[in-house]
């Protein structure tokens, strides 16, 4: 049971309704126009037309929620060439580390539906194990995300250099975010 259950749009205050619309627009831009992808990414329950996932939390303070959403969405907009499979690899490392069932489920569905990662790779990543059959970019993304979460502190120089080679400076900074 969520501490902040999803509400339908008509149950929200005007500022929350604006954020609701902005959230849905951001999800559509991020995952495309396929309604299945939008439902997956926003965890929208079409039977009650309420958005779950992070939205109830973001909507408590709509102006701060918008800033948080815009920062996350902005990374995708300024890094359009960041490899999607590496992005989903890093996302799964993070969501599983923080035990965010919603986000892990959403990123699993995105990675699976676009054939970015295999089921075995997803299972390993979400179990804090680096799959042996990842491509080079996914290995670098996994190693960087894993280091930042489990070891903490600055990336070691060799890992930083691997990130720069794989993703460039902007991509590396985006990955660290």
Per-region residue spans from a language model:
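Short amphipathic alpha-helical segments and their helix-coil junctions
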Residues: 65-80, 122-127, 156-165
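A contiguous pocket-lining binding segment that forms or flanks enzyme active sites
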Residues: 114-146
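Alpha-helical scaffold segments that form or flank carboxylate-/histidine-based iron centers
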Residues: 49-59, 83-97, 173-177
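Acidic/histidine-rich alpha-helical segments that form the ligand environment
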Residues: 135-176
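Conserved alpha-helical segments that form or flank metal/cofactor-binding pockets of metalloenzymes
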Residues: 64-67, 88-119
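Structural motif
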Residues: 44-47, 80-86, 133-138, 166-171
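Secretory/endomembrane lumenal or extracellular ectodomains immediately following the signal peptide
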Residues: 1-82
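Alpha-helical transition-metal enzyme core signature, strongest for iron centers
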Residues: 58-68, 94-101, 141, 145-152
């Amino acid at each position: 049971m969520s501490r902040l259950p999803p509400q339908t749009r008509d149950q929200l205050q005007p500022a929350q309704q604006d954020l609701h619309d902005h959230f849905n627009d951001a999800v559509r831009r991020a995952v495309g126009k396929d309604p299945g992808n939008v439902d997956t990414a926003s965890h929208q329950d079409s039977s009650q037309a309420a958005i779950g996932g992070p939205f109830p939390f973001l909507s408590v303070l709509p102006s701060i929620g918008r800033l948080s959403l815009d920062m996350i969405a902005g990374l995708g907009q300024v890094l359009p060439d960041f490899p999607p499979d590496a992005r989903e690899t890093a996302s799964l490392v993070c969501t599983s580390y923080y035990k965010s069932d919603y986000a892990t489920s959403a990123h699993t569905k995105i990675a699976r539906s676009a054939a970015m990662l295999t089921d075995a790779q997803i299972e390993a990543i979400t179990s804090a194990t680096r799959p042996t059959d990842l491509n080079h970019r996914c290995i670098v993304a996994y190693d960087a995300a894993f280091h930042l979460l489990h070891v903490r502190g600055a990336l070691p120089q060799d890992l930083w250099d691997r990130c720069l080679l794989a993703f460039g400076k902007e991509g590396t900074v985006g990955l660290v975010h």
